[in-house]
Amino acid sequence: MSKTLSFKTYSAKPADVERKWYVIDAEGQVLGRMAAEIARVLRGKHKPQFTPHVDTGDFIVVTNAEKVALSGNKENLKTYFSHSHYPGGVRVDSVKDLLRKKPEKIIEHAVWGMLPHNNLGRQLFRKLKVYAGTQHPHEAQAPTEMKIH
């Protein structure tokens, strides 16, 4: 008798997932390309046991957020729009202002737009840590450096 072949789809369990820590230096990196790679790793799509409804991704620490590069003339033209839901509560911030005040928000906003907008996406987003300088408080996790091409 020959053994029958099984074609069952593997579904990852949260307990089976091994998480790694990566650190990315944002200096000179193009924002959109870097954000796409970060979203892919946060989601876990780089792993063979990727399962769409399970958090299989890794942690990412981004440093030098204030030195991120934008292609074209986006530094002068791109704006971020938000509203407080009160009359006259419109707020429009330019990239130039955000780079000066809160450079972490630019990377967080770009990555959030590339993640699922549901409970899983919020859980994935919590694994992203962005810092303006070169220092970060995650040395104890021994993150490995990730290069983005």
Curated annotation (Swiss-Prot):
A Gene Ontology term for the protein's cellular component: cytosolic large ribosomal subunit
Signal peptide: none
InterPro entries: Ribosomal_uL13, Ribosomal_uL13_bac-type, Ribosomal_uL13_sf
Keyword Ribonucleoprotein tagged: yes
Annotated GO biological process: negative regulation of translation; translation
SUPFAM superfamilies reported in the protein's UniProt record: Ribosomal protein L13 (SSF52161)
Keywords tagged on the record: Ribonucleoprotein, Ribosomal protein
Cysteine pairings via disulfide bonds: none
PANTHER family: LARGE RIBOSOMAL SUBUNIT PROTEIN UL13M, RIBOSOMAL PROTEIN L13
Family: Belongs to the universal ribosomal protein uL13 family.
Name assigned to this protein: Large ribosomal subunit protein uL13
